[in-house]
C-alpha cells in the first residue's frame, strides 16, 4: 500500500530538496520571532 512507498519517497533526491527547503523556511521564520 501507501506505506510501502514511504521509504522510496524519503530516499528520493526531490524529497530531500523539499525537506531542506521547508526546514530552512521554518528556521528562518522561527528566528524572526
Curated annotation (Swiss-Prot):
Q: Where in the cell is it found?
A: Secreted; Target cell membrane
Keywords recorded for this protein, A-Z: Ion transport, Membrane, Secreted, Target cell membrane, Target membrane, Toxin, Transmembrane, Transport
Give the superkingdom in one word: Eukaryota
Concerning InterPro entries, the annotation shows:
Pardaxin (IPR009990)
Q: Which GO terms describe its cellular component?
A: extracellular region; membrane; other organism cell membrane
Keyword Chloroplast part of the UniProt annotation: no
Q: Does the keyword Transport apply?
A: yes
**Which GO biological process categories is it annotated with?**
monoatomic ion transport
Q: Which GO terms describe its molecular function?
A: toxin activity
State the family named in the UniProt similarity comment for this chain.
Belongs to the pardaxin family.
Its assembly, as annotated, is: Monomer. In aqueous solution exists as a tetramer.
Description of its domains: Consists of a C-terminal hydrophilic region and a predominantly hydrophobic remainder.
**Function field:** Exhibits unusual shark repellent and surfactant properties. Forms voltage-dependent, ion-permeable channels in membranes. At high concentration causes cell membrane lysis.
**What is the designated name of this protein?**
Pardaxin P-4
The organism encoding this protein is Pardachirus marmoratus (Finless sole)
Amino acid at each position: 500500500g501507501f506505506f510501502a512507498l514511504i521509504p522510496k519517497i524519503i530516499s528520493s533526491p526531490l524529497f530531500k530538496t523539499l525537506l531542506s527547503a521547508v526546514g530552512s523556511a521554518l528556521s528562518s521564520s522561527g528566528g524572526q520571532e
